[in-house]
Design a protein with these regions (language model features):
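Alpha/beta-hydrolase active-site loop signature
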Residues: 1, 23-27, 69, 94, ...
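Conserved hydrolase catalytic core segment
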Residues: 59-102
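A catalytic-pocket lid/entrance helix-loop region that shapes and gates access to the active site
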Residues: 86-128
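Alpha/beta-hydrolase
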Residues: 110, 114-199
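Conserved loop-alpha-helix segment in the C-terminal half of the alpha/beta-hydrolase fold
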Residues: 191-234
């Protein structure tokens, strides 16, 4: 989670303290190499353990989850929202099946048909270690939908985080394919539960995201007190490729909640 280092340049000057942590099995945390431990309820309880250890509560605790962390943040809020002051769901949809449909119906057709066919063949054979797989995905998918900065300019903290990724954990939860979810989260969907979330909530989407920005806008209308932030130049890593919209919108949300303002727009 070292890619969150970029938040330091924006939140700290606004006197907003933030804490990011590596979950069990990734980054600098222990890796027990026991895939049976990789399930959503255990990760939710891990967030609660971290909250308790840091002494955070509904007076000061904003939970921001990005990508997979957005899934975790939604699940945490549905169980422990009495501990939250605010919720930020960054670049994540509330339904993995709908994410898969968006990947198939919207993202895949943007590929050159020949390149997509080669990727499909590799996936059909489950030959994910084939170097050709990443050679094709990096310029044709990652550079367009993960981070739109030129590949040679990808920020060092982001590259460092990607290099430390626990692929066993990733495949167990997400599945090996980049086109939708195929792991433990394949049927995850809390769309109908969003109205239960009563804490002020910000959903963030990027125009070029791997996730459907219209769905993330819709999510903000389903929670009781929601606001949507669109990063028009952003992709999945909007905190890097559209900082001009991401951070002012995030900071404004936090300050509005702190001031007791209604977040709906």
């Amino acid at each position: 989670h070292e890619y969150f280092e970029c938040f330091e340049s924006f939140l700290l000057p606004q006197d907003i303290e933030f804490i990011y942590y590596d979950q069990l099995g990734c980054g600098l945390s222990d890796n027990p190499k026991d895939t049976s431990m990789w399930d959503l309820p255990r990760f939710v309880e891990e967030v609660e353990q971290v909250r308790k250890a840091l002494g955070l509560n509904k007076d000061n605790f904003y939970l921001l989850g990005h990508s997979w962390g957005g899934i975790l943040a939604m699940q945490y809020a549905l169980k422990y929202q009495d501990n939250l002051k605010g919720l930020i769901i960054s670049n994540m949809m509330s339904s993995c099946p709908l994410y898969g449909k968006y990947a198939q119906d919207v993202l895949a057709p943007q590929f050159d048909p020949k390149i997509l066919d080669t990727i499909r063949q590799i996936e059909a054979k489950k030959d994910f270690d084939n170097p050709k797989y990443m050679e094709l995905l990096t310029p044709h998918f990652y550079a367009k939908h993960i981070c739109r900065l030129p590949l040679e300019q990808w920020p060092e903290p982001m590259v460092r985080s990607f290099n430390k990724m626990n692929h066993s954990l990733y495949v167990t939860m997400q599945g090996p394919s980049e086109f939708g979810i195929g792991g433990n989260l394949v049927n995850w969907d809390v769309s109908k539960e969003l109205p239960k979330i009563k804490v002020p909530t910000l959903t963030i989407g990027g125009t070029h995201d791997t996730m459907d920005p219209e769905h993330m806008k819709w999510m903000s209308t389903q929670v009781q007190h929601g606001r949507y932030l669109l990063c028009p130049n952003g992709s999945h890593m909007s905190m890097y490729d559209d900082q001009a919209h991401y951070f002012p919108g995030l900071i404004e949300f936090i300050k509005d909640v702190d001031a007791g303002k209604e977040v709906k727009r």
